């Protein structure tokens, strides 16, 4: 891969990540609130009837719409964009590093394994994920802390710089890498995602080659390609997210300020014992609703920018 090709993939990946982050930020905030232990702040009591006819109170976490309503009522609409600054600062380099590492790894591994085989896509996605996570974890920790900083209307909100200072004062440099073990566990999601995506993409290309699309108008072919890539990205991400979601909850818990959670397996065990297995999937619906359009937008923007720059 030439230096120009690497720069094209860097720029395209950054553009895709930035556009997706801006459009889906409110859903990201709601998801993070639902994943955290601070969701207990919003928990309400539900009256349940027992066998003897008596009633007992059970604590029930809010659903996505209820959480969204509470954020709007207590904190205002601006809170739905908490953490957008660090997100924009981090998403471009993160996606750029990821796609550049993915493309470079795939080119190298094609010389070792069968070109464009499943092994190539899995290893390339894993190496790219590891590289991006290691480089950008401090940014995502700050983003999570800001999203969890619930303040009522009129109260002074914590800035990104203040958050950085507090993390350093309490935990030092190591504090910026909290939750990284859960992110490494989440590489499995990335691997599954890209294996499915590349498989669907290859099938679409084969279908196009075997069809009579040459007789169609150019605009019709472009529209068909766009829809195909959107569906490929959405399908692959939905499957991957549903399988690997618990690591998202563990990562958010590890990044909480003053957290009682210390390591990946300790957090996994504590959440399971104290809140049950359902807590490991809290926020999944919101996550899927956000990830499907976010990933589709990101991947299509990436493909479009690469196509335009390569002429």
Swiss-Prot record:
Solcar repeats: 4-108, 116-203, 224-308
Membrane topology: Multi-pass membrane protein
Coiled-coil regions listed in the entry: none
GO biological process, one term: pyrimidine nucleotide import into mitochondrion
Transmembrane segments: 7-27, 41-57, 111-131, 180-200, 226-246, 291-311
GO CC aspect terms: mitochondrial inner membrane; mitochondrion
Superkingdom: Eukaryota
Keyword Repeat (UniProt): yes
Signal peptide start-end: none
InterPro entries assigned: Mit_carrier, Mitochondrial_sb/sol_carrier, Mt_carrier_dom_sf, SLC25A33/36-like
Subcellular location(s) of the protein: Mitochondrion inner membrane
GO molecular function term, any single one: pyrimidine nucleotide transmembrane transporter activity
Entry keyword set: Membrane, Mitochondrion, Mitochondrion inner membrane, Repeat, Transmembrane, Transmembrane helix, Transport
Similarity field: Belongs to the mitochondrial carrier (TC 2.A.29) family.
Protein name: Solute carrier family 25 member 36-A
Organism the protein comes from: Danio rerio (Zebrafish)
């Amino acid at each position: 891969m030439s230096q120009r090709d690497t720069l094209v993939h860097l720029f395209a990946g950054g553009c895709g990540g930035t556009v997706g982050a801006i459009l889906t930020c409110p859903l990201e905030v709601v998801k993070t609130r639902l994943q955290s232990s601070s969701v207990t702040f919003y928990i309400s009591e539900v009256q349940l009837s027992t066998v003897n006819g008596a009633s007992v109170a059970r604590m029930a976490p809010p659903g996505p719409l209820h959480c969204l309503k509470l954020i709007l009522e207590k904190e205002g609409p601006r809170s739905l964009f908490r953490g957008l600054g660090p997100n924009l600062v981090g998403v471009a380099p993160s996606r750029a590093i990821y796609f550049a590492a993915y493309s470079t790894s795939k080119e190298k591994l094609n010389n070792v394994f069968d070109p464009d085989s499943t092994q190539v896509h899995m290893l390339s996605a894993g190496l790219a994920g590891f590289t991006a996570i290691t480089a950008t974890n401090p940014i995502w920790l700050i983003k999570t802390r800001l999203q969890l900083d619930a303040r009522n209307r009129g109260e002074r909100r914590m800035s990104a710089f203040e958050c950085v200072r507090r993390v350093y004062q309490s935990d030092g440099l190591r504090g910026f890498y909290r939750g990284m073990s859960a992110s490494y566990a989440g590489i499995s999601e990335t691997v599954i995602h890209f294996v499915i995506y590349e498989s669907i993409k290859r099938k679409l290309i084969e279908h196009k080659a075997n069809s009579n699309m040459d007789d169609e108008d150019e605009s019709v072919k472009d529209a068909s390609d766009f829809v195909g890539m959107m569906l490929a990205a959405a399908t692959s991400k939905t499957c991957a997210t549903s399988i690997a979601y618990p690591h998202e909850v563990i990562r958010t818990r590890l990044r909480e300020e003053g957290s009682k959670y210390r390591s990946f397996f300790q957090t996994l065990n504590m959440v399971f014992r104290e809140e049950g297995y359902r807590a490991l999937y809290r926020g999944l619906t919101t996550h899927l609703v956000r990830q499907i359009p976010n990933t589709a937008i990101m991947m299509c923007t990436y493909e479009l920018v690469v196509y335009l720059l390569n002429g």
